[in-house]
UniProtKB/Swiss-Prot annotation:
GO terms of molecular function: tetrahydrodipicolinate N-acetyltransferase activity
Purpose: Catalyzes the transfer of an acetyl group from acetyl-CoA to tetrahydrodipicolinate.
Classification lineage: Bacteria, Bacillati, Bacillota, Bacilli, Lactobacillales
Record keywords: Acyltransferase, Amino-acid biosynthesis, Diaminopimelate biosynthesis, Lysine biosynthesis, Repeat, Transferase
Gene Ontology BP term (one): lysine biosynthetic process via diaminopimelate
Name by which UniProt lists this protein: 2,3,4,5-tetrahydropyridine-2,6-dicarboxylate N-acetyltransferase
Pathway it works in: Amino-acid biosynthesis; L-lysine biosynthesis via DAP pathway; LL-2,6-diaminopimelate from (S)-tetrahydrodipicolinate (acetylase route): step 1/3
One Pfam family named in its UniProt record: DapH_N
Catalytic activity: (S)-2,3,4,5-tetrahydrodipicolinate + acetyl-CoA + H2O = L-2-acetamido-6-oxoheptanedioate + CoA
Enzyme Commission number(s) from the entry: 2.3.1.89
Length: 233
């Protein structure tokens, strides 16, 4: 998705405050609206719906509802989380992935990683623990994005270029790649680097701001090897 498509999608999306409600009472006597999904055994039940629908329902039936607990984790949210069930990748618990994210075959998304709308993860790429892919950040195939790394997102302003990480790139832990930067194929970004300009292919960059320190050699390749065993499903 380009920035304008994302902006249109967010702008047109119905903003919802989704809740889960566990309740008990004289539920056999209650009429549930069609806008609320209900699992009810007459004395106790569970509701799922938008707070805009659930709140007036609870207030209208307070004489028949003895008690309830509301669970909620967002307010006026426009973008749901991605449905992960049929994605051909390994996605660990605790990863936060918004709808409209693309994940390639045999990619690995570790716990705590955050992928915003429009982000792309190529086949066989690992996004390590706590890494953040901002809106429209694009990562190619067979890359490793280290723990705690941030690939800056660009949705607003829509004319700005996104971060692009080409194939077979390795980025160390806690690096930052700023908006509009392209990291060339086979490059290595050292841990803690702050990348503010494009990185040539097959080079190693390090520092703040990141600078080229050498060309990729056999020693570097051995230290940054991508292991297919970690990507098996």
């Amino acid at each position: 998705m380009d920035a304008y498509e994302i902006i249109q999608y967010i702008g047109d999306a119905k903003k919802q405050t989704l809740v889960k409600v566990t309740l008990k009472g004289q539920l056999k006597e209650v009429t549930f609206p069609e806008t609320i999904k209900v699992f009810n055994n007459c004395k106790t039940g569970t509701l799922f719906g938008d707070w805009a629908d659930v709140k007036p329902f609870l207030e209208a039936n307070k004489e028949k509802i003895e008690d309830y607990v509301v669970e909620n984790d967002a307010r006026n949210s426009a973008i749901p989380f991605l449905d992960l069930k049929d994605i051909n990748a390994r996605i660990e618990p605790g990863a936060l992935i918004r709808e409209k994210v693309e994940i390639g075959d045999q990619a690995v998304i570790m716990m705590g990683a955050i992928l915003n709308i429009g982000a792309v993860v190529g086949a066989g790429t690992m996004i390590d623990m706590g890494a953040v892919l901002g809106g429209r950040a694009t990562v190619g195939k067979h890359c490793h994005i280290g723990a705690g790394t941030v690939l800056a997102g660009v949705i607003e302003p829509p004319s700005a270029a996104p971060v692009v990480i080409e194939n077979e790139v390795v980025i160390g832990a806690n690096a930052v790649v700023l908006e509009g930067v392209r990291v060339g194929e086979g490059a290595v970004v050292a841990a803690g680097a702050v990348v503010v300009e494009d990185v040539p292919a097959h080079t190693v960059v390090a520092g703040v701001p990141a600078k080229v320190i050498k060309q990729i050699d056999d020693k570097t390749k051995s230290k940054t090897e991508i292991l297919e065993e970690l990507r098996k499903l």
